[in-house]
Amino acid sequence: MAPSTGSYLAGSRLFGLVLVCLLMAAATTTSGYRPDPVTGFPQQSIVVDSWPGDKKVAVCFVFYVEVWGFGHGPDFRPDMVKRKPDLVNEYYRQYGINEGIDRIGRLFARLDVPLSVALSALFPDQRPEIWKSFREIQPGASIIAHGMNNSTEQLPLAQGLKAQEVYVGKTLDLVEKSVGVRPKGWSSPSVYANVDTYTATAAEGIKYSLDAMDSDELSRLQTPSGSLLMIPYPVVTVDMGQNLARQQMPVMLEQLWTDYVMELVHEAEVDPDRPATVVAIGIHPFVSGTPSGAAALRRVLERIKEEKLVWLTDVDSIYDHALGQ
């Protein structure tokens, strides 16, 4: 039996009302999004009123445990790279691995400060004795996937989205096999990524990324494969760039890190209603893992541990707190 005119009109009105509600809901859901200037994906600020314990500044140190390979990696003396073999730069890198990794682990354990580790997936198999020793010192450190290695097996940026998905999946599988933990965070090798990287990491189950350098606050990046929590990782706070590219010695890094954190604390004190901030500070064994580097880092940690508004934490805890908001 055909519907009456009244029924048809009522149904049309109901459909129109439902459509309007859906459109309003969609507008509400996307409210606050803006295009990310690099990827073009929608990005939304995540406002955190405070961190656990009414803290206002979250600080996490990300320790890079990487595979470079013989003849690859950062150079302390660029004027000597043409030597064959280049003993000075090779031993500079090896010192960081042989001595610096455990030194950093001991420092954070002794001060009872959480540590996050950005791990090259090939490291545990290539240097098992060093990895075993470090994990005995730091059994609970958060593990962030940092690609296969940092030189010859970086992201296949020119090969398309699918190739990056395979690479990310392989990295996660290998880390899980070696460490027993499947990372939920990602930091691209040498911070060298492209628009496909964000989509690929989300597709492979990554929940947060350190490939974000443009804010003091958390944000959510909406990729075609799902969302990523973007944790601020300012380029100016990374020890390697400051040390090797700008010739900043550890005592200068000490001043930089202290000033950076304390200014965020000061801003929170003068404006208690402003959103809570976060900074992930990148450290490397051949810079911060030297005796002078560790001494400078120790003084920084001792100083900011005294601040009642600072939450010294790890990246997994930042993600968990943001997720629970």
Name what the model sees in each region:
Residues 1-19:
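Classical eukaryotic N-terminal signal peptides for Sec-dependent ER targeting/secretion
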Residues 22-34:
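N-terminal signal peptide
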Residues 33-140, 150, 300-303, 309:
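Active-site beta->alpha N-cap acidic-glycine motif
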Residues 33-53, 173-177, 181-274:
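Active-site-adjacent pocket scaffolds in enzyme catalytic domains
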Residues 40-46, 110-112, 138, 208, ...:
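C-terminal domain-boundary segment and adjacent tail
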Residues 83-85, 102-105, 110-194, 226-227, ...:
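Metal-dependent polysaccharide deacetylase catalytic core of the NodB/CE4 family, i.e.
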Residues 97, 101, 127, 164, ...:
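Aromatic/hydrophobic pocket-lining residues that form the small-molecule binding cavity
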Residues 159-166, 248-252, 292, 296:
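Alpha-helix N-cap and loop-to-helix initiation/capping positions
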